């Protein structure tokens, strides 16, 4: 009996542990939040890891509008939060997976566990801005990460806080009318679809690899979809979700000469997005890149049209309505999270003239640029640490500049100014072995001249220490812009000059008198610093660090010579 009791207790504890480790599935789809609905809630910031327990108020709670808005967009709830004193907020990010991340070992390297919020709007006069981020449930703690900088009192710190919602304040602003899902009777159809990214409503590049529309066969309530993969060599494997798991699709036929194949899979509910997974291979920089990606099929049942044939007996592809074109999407390009999947042109063509002020949606461009010292037309030493050319990618009608930085470990921050506020550039990718990373930032067009602020910290050179922030301008050279959509581009290493230099910048040890600081540090571990950062400090490329290195080397040789003579004597 005693052994039986012990076994039962062990089983109970094991089950308890398992359920604690499994994410809360109920909260992942909060029944109170309807697709297309808009809601209002009260929110609060609490000190790190106290949002569900002692609820210790954070100093950051004083700098938000406690009335937040929740909007459910294409099935995904988003919170819209207004922050005040917005010029102090350099960064705000939230946990990627909903759990509490460990504090980053290096404060500004957090992208593996936190995701930057999206700035929706800014009001410079009121010093406020509206931030947007994903939400799962009204009951979840939103684990947040922030960088607060107040120049007037030399305050600069990163810290973690808990953002919580008070469910009792939940208020419906608007909800869409209930619609009846379309039910198709038994028969054969063609059905248009859109390929969406896995975690948001933007179009996926996978759209270009499948002919549209697809075939649909409904028999006794069972729904089978068949479609043509139009790049058989690139798309090496495809899986779709059935009964909650990803399963390989069935290959109906293959045409190697045409580089196509027809695949078939079952769909349980045509009115819901279908999760899918693809493996692909693509030529990249002289080798073959193998990658994979998640995406979703969204079928338009309202536009399903009766057809006379279905693959298997008659493999004639369905006729595409000329009036319906595929959604404007583009294949992945170098520097993005999913590396490029490109189809080389069959015949060379003369490059089209590009209007730098009228860039086309879903196109990619290469462009040269200059990095100037702040407020001048003199080349900054920073140009020696950025690969060329830059890329401009137009995503959802918004152009973004992609820059690849070398000596990435030295460049701690790389920020651009938007509406008078410095904001971290999004890190797209990084290579620890090559010590590079690729960042992106939005621009108006291909003539942009962008203020950039960077923090350079060099600690890995014996006998030399460098720690400074300064501002430069990155000016795009509109005359060099080229449309390279669907093509690979080779980035060139910059010509290295001695090292990042400063000659006319303030010393790190000339701090002014200490002023009282707001207690943003909820863990009472403020990193006090005596550094004074000039807002518009310039790099002085004429004052080279070669002198320091030369003096260090000469001193070393002289000491070695003295020691040798002493031993001989």
From Swiss-Prot:
* Family annotation (Pfam families): NEAT (PF05031)
Q: What induces it?
A: Expressed in mid-log phase, cotranscribed with lmo2184, the second gene in a possible lmo2186-lmo2180 operon. Present in both exponential and stationary phase; more protein is expressed in log phase (at protein level). Induced under iron-deficient conditions and when fur (lmo1956, AC Q8Y5U9) is deleted (at protein level). Induced when bacteria are grown in human cell lines.
Q: Which GO terms describe its biological process?
A: cellular response to iron ion; iron ion transport
How is it regulated at the activity level?
Is overexpressed in mecA, clpC and clpP mutants, suggesting the protein level is controlled by MecA, ClpC and ClpP (at protein level).
State the phenotype upon gene disruption.
Answer: Moderate reduction in growth rate at 37 degrees Celsius, reduced bacterial density in stationary phase (in strain LO28); no change in bacterial adherence to Caco-2 cells. 2-fold reduction virulence in mice. Does not impair iron transport. More sensitive measurements show that disruption decreases hemin uptake at low concentrations (0.5 uM and 5 uM; at 50 uM no effect is seen). Decreased hemin-binding and hemin uptake by whole bacteria at low concentrations of iron.
Database matches in InterPro entries: IsdA (IPR050436), NEAT_dom (IPR006635), NEAT_dom_sf (IPR037250), Sortase_SrtB_target (IPR017502)
Chain ranges for the short sequence motif NXZTN sorting signal as given in the UniProt record? 536-540
Where is this gene product found?
Cell surface; Secreted, Cell wall; Secreted
Query: Which residue windows does the record flag with biased composition (Polar residues)?
Result: 502-511
> Which residue range or ranges hold the NEAT domain?
34-173, 184-307, 360-484
- Any idea which positions bind heme? 204-205, 280, 289
Q: How does it sit in the membrane?
A: Peptidoglycan-anchor
What does the entry's free-text domain comment contain? Each NEAT domain binds hemin, whereas only NEAT1 and NEAT3 bind hemoglobin.
Q: What is this protein called?
A: Hemin/hemoglobin-binding protein 2
Q: Which organism is it from?
A: Listeria monocytogenes serovar 1/2a (strain ATCC BAA-679 / EGD-e)
Encoding gene per record? hbp2
